[in-house]
């Protein structure tokens, strides 16, 4: 019997509509459209470190995982009630799991392109692991 196991995947809140900590605005409609339009067979969003990705596979800044699915939901309770949340299902590499287990780069930051080349609509191009998320309400990344 082989040791093949399914990769660990988990869904996290990666962005919330409204003002960011640095004064930018995330549109709820953009988050909903990005979730609706996301198709990793068309363009798969990779997880990176601090919005940097190295062309070298053994670099500390190599890809850390993949976004396998997106969904958007309205928040109905708590201090962020009335806003839209974007959730990402992430398939992490072992390195990503190790970093988050160590408490490093435990939050996320989306890379949202407002006009994707396929259809001119919002699309998530990547997702960064960070210690300083711009969006309010991001969930801690934890896979174990």
Annotated model-derived regions:
Residues 1-144:
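N-terminal, leucine/charged-rich tether regions that mediate assembly and partner docking
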């Amino acid at each position: 019997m082989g040791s093949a196991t399914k990769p660990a995947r988990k869904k996290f809140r990666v962005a919330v509509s409204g003002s960011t900590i640095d004064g930018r605005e995330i549109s709820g409609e953009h988050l909903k459209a990005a979730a609706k339009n996301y198709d990793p067979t068309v363009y798969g969003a990779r997880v990176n470190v601090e919005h940097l990705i190295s062309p070298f596979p053994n670099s500390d800044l190599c890809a850390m995982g993949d976004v396998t699915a997106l969904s958007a939901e309205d928040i109905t309770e708590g201090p962020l009630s009335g806003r839209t949340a974007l959730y990402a299902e992430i398939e992490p590499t072992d390195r990503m799991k190790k970093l988050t287990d160590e408490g490093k780069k435990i939050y996320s930051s989306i890379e949202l392109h407002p006009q994707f080349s396929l259809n001119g609509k919002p699309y998530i191009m990547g997702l960064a692991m960070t210690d300083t998320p711009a969006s309010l309400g991001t969930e801690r990344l934890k896979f174990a």
